[in-house]
């Protein structure tokens, strides 16, 4: 997608009303002829403990999905029968104006958000207490997300259905949502490339984290989708490493797992590269396996594919690669049956991406008896319009692998003498596009939203500052 097309899409309003119509459509699959109202509350402002400073604000995602409103202390009332959407915003507090300036007015809110009416929240209680409708009319809301003072004029209030319905809706993204994720990816990709170019000049992980954050903020993305992971050497085998404070000297590889948000929509990108500008023999061998895992998995993704099948393809390729290196020994079928590859690839292949990094609607089963599938955050067939991460990995984490070397089911399938050559590789993790990429599922394949390079030769060239990379 060209930049002008992206900007054109994002110049319009966030499509909250079309999302609401979709929610009602799915709601009526569960409750035929559902009548009444949808009621959602945004995140309320809250002080930090023992402080007069406010907590960092993060809007409730389901509220944002139906409004596009990123203000605190707001409410939404949606009339199912008339499809009328009313947003309630905070009133003007004269004492607060001197500190924070004038807040949004109802007219400004109507111009900014895809709603039919904007009122001050001082009118909310009266309107809710006088809601009317037929005997079947119900207020649909989300459990534990209704302020205690709220009283509805209708007797029927259901807080058990709406959240699950919105979860389902959020799986399939519209053009506006895809544009938001693409924008977040474009900015994050610039940050990743900046780290790669700066790596040879840095002495500590924190300097490279600062490089990423600086590039994202400079391009308008002030919020991160999750705390960045900038892990040198063996720290790369820690899946959610966050210290980012260790020296780079004497380390082979750097793993960077970092993604910015664009207006609450996440990116999730991972890249691994040699700090010296050249992979060691062992690192390149592992990188090539993971690169193959990712590329072959991406090649089979399209609407209707079972995510479990894609995940297992990654494990099969990992086993084949580690057998060729001599780290695994024995028959491929025996290794897969024993699930020994979990020692090196212990997490799921990827997850849905959207308003949350680990987005909703994946229906995971963390109690699955099949350990290969237990940590998959997404299960079942992928629909067109969903966005998933593709992040196979091979890790050399002693805490995980050592018990396998003592286990009767696994120890004869791993050659510990060969394994000893690879401990310093740490972790090589790829997702969709350039180690971990984010892909849009289409009827015939994928659209990779992640643009930063991932081919090992290109990575080495960028680190060394070669022309044309």
Curated annotation (Swiss-Prot):
Entry keywords, A to Z: Aminopeptidase, Hydrolase, Manganese, Metal-binding, Metalloprotease, Protease
Names of the cofactor(s): Mn(2+)
Keyword Transmembrane: no
GO molecular-function terms, A-Z: manganese ion binding; metalloaminopeptidase activity
Domain of life: Eukaryota
GO biological process: proteolysis
Protein residues bound to Mn(2+) 2: 257, 268, 436
Catalytic reactions of this protein: Release of any N-terminal amino acid, including proline, that is linked to proline, even from a dipeptide or tripeptide
Documented EC number(s): 3.4.11.9
Top EC class of this enzyme: hydrolase
InterPro entries given in the database record: Aminopep_P_N (IPR007865), Creatin/AminoP/Spt16_N (IPR029149), Creatinase/aminopeptidase-like (IPR036005), Pept_M24 (IPR000994), X-Pro_dipept-like (IPR052433)
Cofactor binding note: Binds 2 manganese ions per subunit.
Annotated residues for binding of Mn(2+) 1: 268, 391, 436
Protein name, as recorded: Probable Xaa-Pro aminopeptidase PEPP
Source organism phylogeny: Eukaryota, Fungi, Dikarya, Ascomycota, Pezizomycotina
Gene: PEPP
């Amino acid at each position: 997608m060209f930049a002008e097309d992206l900007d054109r899409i994002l110049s319009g309003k966030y499509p909250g009303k079309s999302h609401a119509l979709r929610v009602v459509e799915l709601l009526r699959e569960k409750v035929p002829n559902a009548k009444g109202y949808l009621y959602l509350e945004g995140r309320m402002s809250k002080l930090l403990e023992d402080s007069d400073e406010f907590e960092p604000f993060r809007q409730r995602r389901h509220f944002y999905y139906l409004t596009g409103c990123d203000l605190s202390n707001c409410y939404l009332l949606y009339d199912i029968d008339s499809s009328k959407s009313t947003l309630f915003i905070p009133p003007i507090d004269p004492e607060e104006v001197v500190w924070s300036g004038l807040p949004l007015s109802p007219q400004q809110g109507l111009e900014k958000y895809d709603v039919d009416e904007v009122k001050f929240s001082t009118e909310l209680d009266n309107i809710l207490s006088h809601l009317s409708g037929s005997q079947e009319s119900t207020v649909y809301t989300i459990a534990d997300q209704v302020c205690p003072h709220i009283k509805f004029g209708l007797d029927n209030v259901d807080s058990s259905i709406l959240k699950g319905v919105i979860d389902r809706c959020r799986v399939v993204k519209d053009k506006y949502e895809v544009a938001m994720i693409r924008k977040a990816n474009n900015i994050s990709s610039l940050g990743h490339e900046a780290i790669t170019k700066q790596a040879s000049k840095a002495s500590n992980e924190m300097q490279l984290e600062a490089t990423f954050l600086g590039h994202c903020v400079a391009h308008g993305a002030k919020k991160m989708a999750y705390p960045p992971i900038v892990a040198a050497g063996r720290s790369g085998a820690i899946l959610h490493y966050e210290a980012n404070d260790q020296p780079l000297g004497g380390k082979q590889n750097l793993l960077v797992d970092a993604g910015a948000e664009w207006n609450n929509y996440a990116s999730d990108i991972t890249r691994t590269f040699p700090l010296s500008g050249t992979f060691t023999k062992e690192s390149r061998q592992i990188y090539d396996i993971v690169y193959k895992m990712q590329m072959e998995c991406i090649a089979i993704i399209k609407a209707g594919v079972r995510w479990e099948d894609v995940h297992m393809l990654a494990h099969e390729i990992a086993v084949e690669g580690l057998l060729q290196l001599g780290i695994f020994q024995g028959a491929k079928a025996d290794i897969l049956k024993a699930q020994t590859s979990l020692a090196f690839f212990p997490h799921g292949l990827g997850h849905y991406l959207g308003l949350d990094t680990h987005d909703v609607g994946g229906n995971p089963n963390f109690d699955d008896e099949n350990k290969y599938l237990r940590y998959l955050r997404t299960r079942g067939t992928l629909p067109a319009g969903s966005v998933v991460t593709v992040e196979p990995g091979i890790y050399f984490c002693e805490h995980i692998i050592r018990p396998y070397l003592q286990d009767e089911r696994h120890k004869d399938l791993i050659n510990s003498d060969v394994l000893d050559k690879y401990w310093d590789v740490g972790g090589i993790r790829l997702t969709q596009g350039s180690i971990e990429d984010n892909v849009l599922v289409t009827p015939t394949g994928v659209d990779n939203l992640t643009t930063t390079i991932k081919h090992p030769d290109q990575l080495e060239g960028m680190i060394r500052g070669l022309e044309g990379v």
